[in-house]
């Protein structure tokens, strides 16, 4: 889709198929690059519905647009917010564009976009292993799993089955823990490793994406003068994790986007 009107028309079509007037409506794969970098606002999404929460996830996965109802439910529809993750309109209220995992997760539960849905389930792992056989792949990874106790238990059961035909290497995503607690957690996970389930590694996302401008860029910055992007983890925390991980012999995979994050 190359216009905001086209996006809204498709959302309206989907909205009409929902019986519950308060049920959330979710969309994904939005990319303003194809729209002349026009930004979707809560006012735009309010044209689809003001009674149900609506969200549209960007193709980059780093930005979420929501309507006024979603902001209200999450407590973000207020003045006084002063953070680059939450752009404000001329009235000092959030525009509805939310950048980065922390602010996105604060509204996710109200719009049907719970990050736990991105974790693998048993059937998904079984089906994926069959695809691996067809492609001749023996070892696969999940590079951003929260690895909750429930998820780890599920992975243990699925990968221990005689007909599971791949080796799975999921990485613990750094979110919601201190560096020391993170290292301790992956140390505990490593003890649960088996031949077909290799645990005990870390995944860090350092900054936002270049699409939408939340990546951290060196001088001279973005071509259009947009403010520099977001650190998803402070450089000080990142350094602490690296030092602790090296001491503990833990592998860390770091995802970066902007050249300043390098």
Predicted features and spans:
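Short amphipathic
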Residues: 198-202
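Divalent metal-binding segments
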Residues: 1-184, 204-261
């Amino acid at each position: 889709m190359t216009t905001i009107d086209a996006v809204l028309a498709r959302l309206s079509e989907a909205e009409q198929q929902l019986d519950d007037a308060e049920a959330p409506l979710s969309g994904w794969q939005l990319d303003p690059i194809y729209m002349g970098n026009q930004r979707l606002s809560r006012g735009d999404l309010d044209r689809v519905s003001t009674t149900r929460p609506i969200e549209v996830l960007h193709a980059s996965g780093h930005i979420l647009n929501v309507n006024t109802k979603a902001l209200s439910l999450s407590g973000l529809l207020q003045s006084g917010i002063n953070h680059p993750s939450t752009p404000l309109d001329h009235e000092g209220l959030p525009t509805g564009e939310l950048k980065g995992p922390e602010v996105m997760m604060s509204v996710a539960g109200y719009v049907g976009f719970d990050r736990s849905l991105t974790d693998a389930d048993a059937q998904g792992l079984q089906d994926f292993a069959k695809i691996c056989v067809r492609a001749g792949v023996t070892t696969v990874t999940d590079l951003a799993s929260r690895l909750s106790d429930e998820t780890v238990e599920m992975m243990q059961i699925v990968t221990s089955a005689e007909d599971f035909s791949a080796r799975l290497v999921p990485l613990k995503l750094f979110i919601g823990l201190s560096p020391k607690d993170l290292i301790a957690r992956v140390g505990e996970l490593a003890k649960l490793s088996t031949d077909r389930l290799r645990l005990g590694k870390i995944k860090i996302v350092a900054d936002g994406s270049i699409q939408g401008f939340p990546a951290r860029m060196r001088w001279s910055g973005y071509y259009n003068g947009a403010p520099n992007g977001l650190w998803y983890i402070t450089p000080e925390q990142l350094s602490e994790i690296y030092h602790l991980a090296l001491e503990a012999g833990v592998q860390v995979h770091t995802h970066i986007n902007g050249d300043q994050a390098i």
